[in-house]
Amino acid sequence: MERRLTAILAADVVGYSRLMGANESGTVTALETLRSDFINPKIGEHQGRIVKLTGDGMLVEFPSVVNAVACAAEVQRGVRDRNKGVPPDRRIEFRIGVNVGDVIVQGGDILGDGVTWPRAWKALPRLVA
C-alpha cells in the first residue's frame, strides 16, 4: 500500500442544486467553460493534479501547500472577477478547502483523513481572497 504526504484541495460550487434547478444546461455549460478556460490552467500552473471531478466539485493534489493555497486564492479572485456583471442568482462561486495530510494511493485515486479534512473545511465561512 503506497502512502505519501501531499497537499489536497477540495472545491465545490456554492448553490449548485439551485443553479441546476434554475437552468441545468446553462449551468453545466458555464461550469465546463470555467473549468476548461480558467480553473484547469490555474491548477496546471501550480503543478496540481486533478484526482477526481464530481458534478459540482473537484479533488486536486499538489506537491506543496504553498502551491495549493496560491491556486485556491487565484481561482477565487478570478472567479470573482468573472462574476462581475452576472446576476447574483446566476453566479458560479466556489467553496475551497486545503489540507496537508498523509494519503493512501490507490491507482489514480487518493484516500484517507488527509482527503476528508478539506471537504469538512469547505463548510466554514468563506474568506475573501
Locate predicted features:
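Catalytic NTP-binding/metal-coordinating core of nucleotidyl cyclase/transferase enzymes
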Residues: 1-78
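Catalytic beta-strand-to-alpha-helix segment of the class III nucleotidyl cyclase homology domain
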Residues: 40, 59-129
